[in-house]
Amino acid sequence: MGLLDYFRGSRTDSAAVAKERLQILVAHERAERNKPDYLPLLQKELLEVIRKYVNVGQDAITVTMEKDDNREVLELNVVLPDAIESRPKRKRG
């Protein structure tokens, strides 16, 4: 019955893998739920300001908020191109 045991063993393993994946998904959902509502708008506005001076892509900026015991950390990551191409200055007036 070694063949039968082989299939039974894989079911247990696949159930454990499925459970682990589900736990990861739930953890990500909970993390997303705890984000402030203004975070997407902040990211959009920061991208607009950066684009005034440097040509960057839509996904060049990430804004994350992390909570530790008694503090909150707002992390801003901006990926700049290798050769910085500044935008032409606009005439005021």
From Swiss-Prot:
<protein>
    <recommendedName>
        <fullName>Cell division topological specificity factor</fullName>
    </recommendedName>
</protein>
<dbReference type="InterPro" id="IPR036707">
    <property type="entry name" value="MinE_sf"/>
</dbReference>
<keyword id="KW-0131">Cell cycle</keyword>
<dbReference type="InterPro" id="IPR005527">
    <property type="entry name" value="MinE"/>
</dbReference>
<dbReference type="GO" id="GO:0032955">
    <property type="term" value="P:regulation of division septum assembly"/>
</dbReference>
<comment type="function">
    <text>Prevents the cell division inhibition by proteins MinC and MinD at internal division sites while permitting inhibition at polar sites. This ensures cell division at the proper site by restricting the formation of a division septum at the midpoint of the long axis of the cell.</text>
</comment>
<dbReference type="GO" id="GO:0051301">
    <property type="term" value="P:cell division"/>
</dbReference>
<dbReference type="Pfam" id="PF03776">
    <property type="entry name" value="MinE"/>
</dbReference>
<keyword id="KW-0132">Cell division</keyword>
<comment type="similarity">
    <text>Belongs to the MinE family.</text>
</comment>
